[in-house]
Amino acid sequence: MADANSADALTVKSNVSPAFSIYYLLMVHDHMMYFGDKALVKRHLPAIDGILGFFDRNLSEQGLVGKSGGPIMRHRYWSFIDGAGVWDSGVPAATGKGSGSVTMESLLYLYGLQKAAELAEFAGRTDTAAEYRQRAGALSDAIRTYCFE
């Protein structure tokens, strides 16, 4: 079996990284900014709603993104942040300690909510845009409260 830090680790087992889904949302936003393609945005909004719903369902009591995964091959979801050699398969050591909340995942979710609000507004879904902005505000408050001294 492949080591979790080896080059072929990704091919050994199913690997789902919720954080990568935020990058998909950001690509749709980039497309909107460059091309103004409302039809494409409308086509992708249901998937974006689902992505943001996953993160919303995984908020901790503090309002941060709670532990939804960990290192690849040992958890259902892969909490990949960066390929730093000192981290176990791209996951910060802090993920396994305390609350398990990963500040970077909360920050990614916040950025995703902000950009999804712009997408929803662009597509004429003003109620959804307002909801995403409200969720972003609550998450931003939680990040300021719990992630910084």
PLM feature spans:
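Membrane-interface coil-to-helix junctions
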Residues: 5-6, 21
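Well-ordered alpha-helical segments within folded domains of soluble proteins
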Residues: 18-30, 102-117
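Conserved, well-structured interaction surfaces
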Residues: 12-13
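Active-site acid/base region of carbohydrate-active enzymes
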Residues: 1-4, 34-107, 120-149
